[in-house]
Design a protein with these regions (language model features):
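Structural preference for beta-rich elements and adjacent junctions enriched in aromatics
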Residues: 1-171
């Protein structure tokens, strides 16, 4: 992960045996198939965070999540275009980029502009700022779900109080 004056840059890479991804539209329930996920909680004073998911087929889900006492629902961005839209690309290693293909892995690179993160507070981050965050991978090889997480949470990825911490260093 890198950051600039305009947004955040991510590159996520994972090994995989089978490309379990069939959804061909954005803003679907991508987490039910192979996916990388990023959660950004920019201000601990408010239980609202940003969630971004990307599938091997380059489909995405970008939502703002208010989470009050474990009750949460994602809100889609309004005017998700131009400078507010992410820039993204995915690639597959060792096989074709198609549903159920045998592969060796896949990677995603994407840019999340700060304009998309508004109205969250503490955006853009200043030098020394701290955000809470988590990074996840869902994999469904052999019909079974396997998941990885950067900061251990629990039953739900939405246990934001257990997210890890990012500190933004100077340039």
């Amino acid at each position: 992960m890198l950051y600039s004056n305009t947004g955040l840059y991510f590159l996520i890479d994972g090994t995989d045996r089978t490309l379990t991804a069939t959804m061909n539209d954005d803003f679907l329930d991508l987490w039910t198939e192979d996916v990388f996920e990023v959660f950004l909680w920019t201000d601990e004073r408010s239980p609202v965070y940003f969630e971004y998911e990307i599938s091997p087929l380059n489909r995405e889900l970008a939502i703002l999540v208010p989470n009050f006492g474990g009750q949460f629902l994602g809100w889609r961005p309004w005017h998700y275009e131009g400078g507010r839209a992410t820039r993204k690309a995915t690639s597959v290693i060792g096989g074709p980029k198609q549903a159920h293909a045998s592969i060796q892995g896949w990677r995603a690179e994407f840019f999340i502009p700060y304009t998309l993160l508004r109205p969250l507070q503490n955006v853009p981050p200043k030098e020394g700022a701290r955000w809470r965050a988590n990074f996840y991978r869902m994999d469904y090889d052999g019909g079974q779900r396997t998941q990885w997480e950067w900061a251990r949470v629990g039953e739900s990825f939405h246990e934001y109080l257990k997210f890890g911490e990012l500190q933004f260093a100077g340039r």
